[in-house]
Amino acid sequence: MAVRWWIIPMLLLVPGSSGAWEVLSLPFSLYNFYECGFKVDIEALDCDLARNVFGQHLAQELLFKSVKEFIESDNPSKPLVLSLHGWSGTGKTFVSSLLVKHLFKEGSQSRFVHFFSPVLHFPRVQNLEQYKVDLKGWIQGNLTACGRSLFVFEEMDKMHPGLIDAIVPFLGTSWVVYGSNYRKAIFLFISNAGGDDINEVALDFWRQRKDREDIRLHHLESAISKAVFSNPKHGFWQSQIINQHLIDVIVPFLPLRPSHVRQCVRTEMVQQGLEPEEVLVNNITDSFVYFPEDEKVFSSTGCKTVASRINYFV
């Protein structure tokens, strides 16, 4: 294949003197424009999800199916838009990192993977209108550079309502927006909101002695939608993304049982080069706080603090 180079404008988001983020135009050289570092290993993604994500049968199934179908399409009808919901520590951020790892050659270091944090990038509500301009410019500039980009919006429950609507033009079915085809992009929204409702459903299944793996999306989707999209403090409050049905799949993450925490502990110990001795693994697992207080069914923090607890016990 011949080597091809393009010089195109790239937009850089930098902090301005007012506290808002400003968009700067920089020259940007692209090698093999149509590839954009997009190197898919779908089998490795499937394997990684199965081996390293615990207690999330539904999330694994929904994510893998939707991503596989999307990347196998030569002409997708719209960008893939996924919204991940569940309590902290249940695996949302970890799963998004696996997607990045197996979709892009350089993983999270790829210039075509973009992460947004409301607390870091959009902290001041008084700058909301400027943030909208900056965010739209950033998305437009980077999608013009590469239609195979991935955008991850973390902590949507902390985003100022109204801000996310700035990206609505890039999420629909249009062939071309602002001169470029954006339908091969992927957008991930991550939120803790809806976690309480997911937990209630999981707890009801446990109390009724129903198999956890029998929990399906239809058991959760309505409750998540109501909790998230009707919350005036959430980033999706009265959003056109919701009104126009631009989210393709809601992905619930279930609360984790002690057995799942134990798996997390073992895996982390092996990654640290430690011997996962049974007594030590059990002691670390037992140190977590579980709820409800009288039944101790689920971990209050999922697997979030596993690494720090191992360091404490070791």
UniProtKB/Swiss-Prot annotation:
Keywords: ATP-binding, Endoplasmic reticulum, Glycoprotein, Nucleotide-binding, Signal. One of its GO terms (biological process) is chaperone cofactor-dependent protein refolding. Residues 1-19 form the signal peptide. ATP binds at G86, W87, S88, G89, T90, G91, K92, T93. PANTHER family: TORSIN, TORSIN-2A. SUPFAM superfamilies: P-loop containing nucleoside triphosphate hydrolases. The keyword Signal applies. InterPro entries: P-loop_NTPase, TOR1A_C, Torsin, Torsin_1/2. This is Torsin-2A. It is found in: Endoplasmic reticulum lumen. It comes from the Eukaryota. One of its GO terms (molecular function) is ATP binding. One of its GO terms (cellular component) is nuclear envelope. The keyword Aminoacyl-tRNA synthetase does not apply. Belongs to the ClpA/ClpB family. Torsin subfamily. Its main location: endoplasmic reticulum. Homohexamer. Glycans are attached at N142, N283.
